[in-house]
């Protein structure tokens, strides 16, 4: 039996404490997922920042990064179902992001960046 391939080791950054922890996690997730999915962030950084902030808030309060751009009768129930947890099913299946967080290269609002810094998220989301 051949040995299992080893996964590359990922250097973990020291995460900030308190409120910034979920924001740092969701920022890192966004940067990684944009690259993996070959999508781009909105050309207007405040759109990206506000969505990441909403995802971080939901992660902190609900335990899951529930899409912040939709209305829910019961957020806790929706978070448990997982359909609208980021990346949501429409994004995973069809590359359709209602929040404009992950945009295909041909989208008129897509910027050139697949990365945003934690500092820029804070700056553009008025934290």
Residue ranges and their predicted role:
Residues 1-14:
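N-terminal chloroplast transit peptides
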Residues 15-127:
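Long, distal/terminal scaffolding or interaction modules
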């Amino acid at each position: 039996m051949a040995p299992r391939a080893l996964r590359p080791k990922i250097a973990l950054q020291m995460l900030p404490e308190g409120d910034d922890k979920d924001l740092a996690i969701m920022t890192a997730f966004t940067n990684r997922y944009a690259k993996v999915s070959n999508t781009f962030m909105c050309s207007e950084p405040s759109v990206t920042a506000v969505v990441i902030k909403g995802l971080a808030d939901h992660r902190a309060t609900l335990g899951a990064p529930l899409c912040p751009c939709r209305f829910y009768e019961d957020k806790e129930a929706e978070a448990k179902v997982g359909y609208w947890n980021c990346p949501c099913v429409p994004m995973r299946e069809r590359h359709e992001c209602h929040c404009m967080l992950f945009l295909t290269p041909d989208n008129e609002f897509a910027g050139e960046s697949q990365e945003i810094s934690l500092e820029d998220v804070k700056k553009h989301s008025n934290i």
